[in-house]
């Protein structure tokens, strides 16, 4: 089905002029980002005109929009974007408030009804590992800030050389959160295999050195603590992905020997910068760890990749696939400055004026209408051939049959008859129905000053080819699917 497009009403008037100026600015900005060859100094775009010839549109199919059109980007509408952000923020705030109330109930022994903004902020910071010094110092440790990492995992050894200085661990503190199960907390994990506070774990080591880096779920940042239990937030560290397995502790299986070979090569373990001053304490911890039954299973969990936020499909969403043919008089005016290297490099620059006076275009366009937005793009020749190739082949077959009916005795040349009789010749390959989108670009060039109706210089083919190649590349990069343009309607 063909469509008659009122080209003059769409491209004239204030709206048409504004659209033409936006297209000119867009092409000009793209040329400023293109690396220019040595003989061209700059390229500027001065004007753009739609022309008076309208393109030919033929609808091929009306279907559901592509999935890519439902992905939300940063350039969404302000109203709908703010609604989505507010709804997501309110749900996150409500979940954090519930976790905060459960957290205070577990640690203080009573439940508080209601949370202010500061408590919510502190609760959210605990989940992401961003704990301020005031909030952390208010919590009471289990018994003493000893390195539970030495007991929970044989790979967390204080005798290993430093990898990243200035970071310590807060695994000595037990922070019960509502979103953590019982098997994920240090208390229950240690209780499965016996208490670490035996004769081999003196309380005196709490003042001798700092602890190893580690956070729940591997999302936290290490913090440095002194004797007053103050935290320093200036030393970030790599996240640890070590998860303890209480099952191994319950069976009392020791795997220190199996993990001793790769202890110093574990890239997920981060050590502090006080190991040199606490060598004796580190050896004591090492001997105590050999007598205990540590766990040695570390689950390497990679963080899931964020999935793009998708809009909800609606029954009124639709997509139009149409064939676009255009052989019009669109105009684009550019200037490029050519550098002459004689008698010295960049001796003089000559302005070259290029006027694109027409474009021949043949391709498949996709227009999707979703929630007051119109998405426009073109399909590549391969995609267009796969989508509409069979239909175009049927049309071409019907046209050939009509030609044969009009000329029942066609003449064949000698080369075709020879190829048909030769069995070694390969059959002709199926020809692609869709070629390049921009099939032809007509350009007029003018360089230097005109004297007596003649140009001062000629043979500017290199500059013309460069500019035309860039015009093709900009069009293919910005308009060919999966790239598309969105218009608010």
UniProtKB/Swiss-Prot annotation:
PROSITE patterns: SMP. Residues 1-489 form the SMP-LTD domain. One of its GO terms (cellular component) is endoplasmic reticulum membrane. It is a peripheral membrane protein. GO terms for molecular function: lipid binding. GO terms for biological process: mitochondrial genome maintenance; mitochondrion-endoplasmic reticulum membrane tethering; phospholipid transport; protein insertion into mitochondrial outer membrane. HAMAP family: Mdm12. Belongs to the MDM12 family. This is Mitochondrial distribution and morphology protein 12. The lineage of its organism: Eukaryota, Fungi, Dikarya, Ascomycota, Pezizomycotina.
């Amino acid at each position: 089905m063909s469509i008659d497009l009122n080209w003059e009403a769409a491209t004239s008037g204030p709206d048409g002029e504004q659209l033409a100026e936006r297209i000119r600015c867009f092409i000009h900005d793209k040329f400023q980002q293109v690396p220019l060859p040595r003989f061209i100094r700059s390229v500027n775009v001065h004007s753009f005109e739609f022309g008076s010839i309208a393109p030919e549109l033929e609808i091929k199919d009306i279907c559901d929009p592509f999935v890519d059109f439902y992905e939300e980007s940063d350039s969404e509408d302000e109203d709908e974007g703010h609604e989505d952000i507010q709804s997501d923020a309110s749900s996150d705030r409500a979940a954090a408030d519930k976790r905060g109330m459960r957290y205070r109930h577990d640690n203080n022994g009573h439940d508080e009804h209601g949370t202010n903004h500061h408590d919510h902020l502190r609760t959210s910071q605990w989940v992401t590992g961003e704990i301020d010094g005031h909030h952390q110092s208010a919590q009471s440790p289990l018994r003493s800030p000893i390195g539970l990492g030495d007991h929970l995992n044989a790979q967390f050894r204080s005798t290993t050389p430093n990898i990243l200085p200035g970071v310590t661990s807060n695994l000595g503190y037990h922070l019960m959160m509502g979103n953590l199960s019982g098997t994920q907390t240090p208390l229950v994990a240690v209780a499965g295999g016996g208490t670490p506070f035996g004769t081999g774990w003196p309380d005196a080591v709490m003042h001798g050195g700092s602890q190893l880096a580690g956070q729940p779920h591997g999302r936290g940042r290490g913090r440095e603590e002194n004797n007053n239990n103050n935290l320093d937030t200036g030393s970030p560290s790599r996240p640890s992905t070590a998860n303890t397995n209480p099952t191994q502790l319950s069976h009392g299986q020791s795997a220190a020997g199996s993990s001793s070979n790769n202890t110093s090569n574990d890239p997920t373990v981060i050590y502090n910068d006080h190991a040199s001053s606490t060598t004796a304490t580190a050896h004591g911890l090492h001997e105590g760890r050999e007598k205990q039954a540590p766990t040695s299973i570390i689950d390497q969990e990679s963080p899931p990749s964020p999935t793009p936020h998708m809009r909800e499909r609606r029954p009124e969403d639709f997509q139009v696939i149409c064939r676009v043919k255009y052989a019009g008089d669109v105009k684009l005016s550019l200037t490029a400055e050519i550098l002459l290297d004689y008698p010295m490099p960049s001796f003089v620059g000559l302005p070259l004026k290029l006027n694109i006076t027409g474009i021949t275009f043949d391709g498949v366009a996709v227009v999707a209408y979703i929630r007051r937005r119109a998405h426009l793009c073109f399909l590549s020749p391969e995609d267009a051939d796969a989508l509409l190739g069979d239909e175009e082949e049927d049309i071409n077959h019907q046209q050939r049959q009509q030609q044969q009916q009009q000329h029942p005795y066609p003449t064949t040349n000698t080369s075709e008859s020879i190829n048909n009789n030769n069995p070694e010749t390969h059959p002709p390959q199926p020809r692609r129905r869709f070629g390049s989108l921009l099939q032809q670009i007509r350009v007029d060039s003018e360089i230097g000053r005109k004297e007596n109706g003649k140009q001062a210089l000629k043979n500017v083919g290199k500059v013309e080819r460069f500019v035309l190649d860039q015009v093709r590349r900009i069009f293919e990069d910005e308009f060919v699917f999966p790239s598309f343009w969105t218009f608010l309607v």
